[in-house]
Structures are given as structure tokens and as C-alpha cells.
């Protein structure tokens, strides 16, 4: 059973000039680099936070996974990272392979070893990240924060954190306890915002755009 301190992490945004949140990247490394240049992202002063799903389906999952080593990049875990971790732990890889994990089977031995080392970093990714900015508090998770009120280290259903689309489908409303909530997981034609909830997976790997939002 996961301890609350392994599920939640907190970041003080005062340590950076700007903080950006990015939607599901899914291996689209070159697209991400292009968008960062367009946003004038400065890796010396800025922080990029991913809503998860760095890997699978796109052309460079290994390159995107390697971003976890960069000091200017952090992420919450997505359902695709979790599928990869589950596959590596159990040797039951069917679900992962059916959902874009076949890139791993095509790696050279050298690159596979690199990926295995990076999956260790994935094990440390939180499910929920709280970012304390100068004038607001932002909560980032992959698919949902499955409660009507946010509370630091509150017990929540982790499967729903990674997989749920209920709030988005039903437009169930906002969440109290923080100023803004940022999710990905469900590819949309354009960013969707209602109440204080923001969905920013705009289907980059399916021919859409890669959405970045500056929260500080």
C-alpha cells in the first residue's frame, strides 16, 4: 500500500521564474522542443510540469522519458507510465503493448537498458502534485482528483486519478481546496476549462496540438 507521502508531492514555485504545465506528450519529443522554443522557455529559470503520459504511441518515447533526468522537468505519473511499470514488475505486458508500449520491444539492448533505468525514475513519480505559486495553488494529476474537496495527503482512489473521465464527461464542476486543477488523459480538440478545472490533453500524438499553460 502506498503511503500518502509517496502519492503527493509539493513544489514551491518561487524557485522559478515561470512554471508551465504541459499536456500528454506521448513520445512527441520534437513537438515539445518546438513548443518550448515558441514559449521562450528558459531551462535555467523555468520549470515544466507534465500531466503524465510522457511515453507510448509517439516517435520518441525514450527521449521523452529521459526528460525526467532534467532539472527543469518534472511530472506526475500517467496511466501509460503505470502500465509500463506494471508490465516490468509482472512480465505481463499485453495491456501495455496494446496501448502503445511496443516501442520498448524495438529498442536495442543499449537503449533498453537506458529505458529500464528511467523506469526506476518513474517509480518515484507522484500521482498528485501541488504547486504553490505566488498568488495561487495549483493541483496537477493525470486524469482527475476524485473528490469534491482537495486536501493535502487525503486518501483518494488512485485508479481514478489515472483513468477517470467521469468529471469531464459529466462536467461535474469544480473542486474546492485549491485554486486550479490541471488534468490530461482525454484527448480533446482544444483545451477545456470549466469552474477551476482545466483539461489540456489536446491530442498531440493524434495530429492535434501540444498545449502548454503558464501558471506562474
From Swiss-Prot:
Molecular function (Gene Ontology), one example: phosphatase activity
Stated pH dependence: Optimum pH is 6-7.
Disulphide bonds in the chain: none
Keyword Plastid: no
Control of this protein's activity: Inhibited by cadmium, copper, zinc when added cobalt when added concomitantly with manganese.
Catalytic activity reported: O-phospho-L-seryl-[protein] + H2O = L-seryl-[protein] + phosphate; O-phospho-L-threonyl-[protein] + H2O = L-threonyl-[protein] + phosphate
Necessary cofactors: Mn(2+)
EC numbers: 3.1.3.16
Keyword Protease tagged: no
Binding-site list for Mn(2+) 1: 24, 26, 53
Catalytic-site annotation from UniProt: 80 (proton donor)
InterPro entries: Ap4A_hydrolase, Calcineurin-like_PHP_ApaH, Metallo-depent_PP-like, Ser/Thr-sp_prot-phosphatase
Residues at which Mn(2+) 2 binds: 53, 79, 185
Family classification: Belongs to the PPP phosphatase family. PP-1 subfamily.
UniProt xrefs under PANTHER family: METALLOPHOSPHOESTERASE, SERINE_THREONINE-PROTEIN PHOSPHATASE 1
NCBIfam families the UniProt entry points to: PRK11439.1 (NF008516)
Protein name stated in the entry: Serine/threonine-protein phosphatase 1
Species this chain originates from: Salmonella typhimurium (strain LT2 / SGSC1412 / ATCC 700720)
Amino acid at each position: 500500500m502506498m503511503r500518502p507521502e509517496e502519492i503527493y508531492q509539493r513544489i514551491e514555485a518561487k524557485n522559478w521564474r515561470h512554471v508551465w504545465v504541459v499536456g500528454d506528450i506521448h513520445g512527441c519529443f520534437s513537438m515539445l522542443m518546438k513548443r518550448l522554443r515558441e514559449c521562450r522557455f528558459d531551462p535555467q529559470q523555468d520549470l515544466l510540469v507534465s500531466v503524465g503520459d510522457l511515453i507510448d504511441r509517439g516517435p520518441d518515447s525514450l527521449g521523452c522519458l529521459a526528460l525526467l533526468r532534467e532539472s527543469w522537468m518534472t511530472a506526475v505519473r500517467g496511466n501509460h507510465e503505470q502500465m509500463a511499470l506494471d508490465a516490468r514488475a509482472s512480465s505481463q505486458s499485453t495491456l501495455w503493448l496494446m496501448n502503445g508500449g511496443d516501442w520498448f520491444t524495438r529498442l536495442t539492448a543499449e537503449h533498453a537498458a537506458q529505458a529500464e533505468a528511467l523506469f526506476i525514475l518513474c517509480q518515484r513519480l507522484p500521482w498528485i502534485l501541488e504547486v504553490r505559486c505566488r498568488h495561487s495553488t495549483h493541483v496537477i494529476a493525470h486524469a482527475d482528483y476524485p473528490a469534491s474537496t482537495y486536501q493535502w495527503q487525503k486518501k483518494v482512489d488512485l485508479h481514478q486519478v489515472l483513468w477517470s473521465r467521469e468529471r469531464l464527461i459529466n462536467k461535474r464542476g469544480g473542486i474546492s481546496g485549491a485554486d486550479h486543477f490541471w488534468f490530461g488523459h482525454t484527448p480533446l480538440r482544444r483545451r477545456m476549462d470549466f469552474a477551476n478545472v482545466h483539461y489540456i490533453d489536446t491530442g498531440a500524438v493524434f495530429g492535434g496540438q501540444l498545449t502548454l499553460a503558464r501558471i506562474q
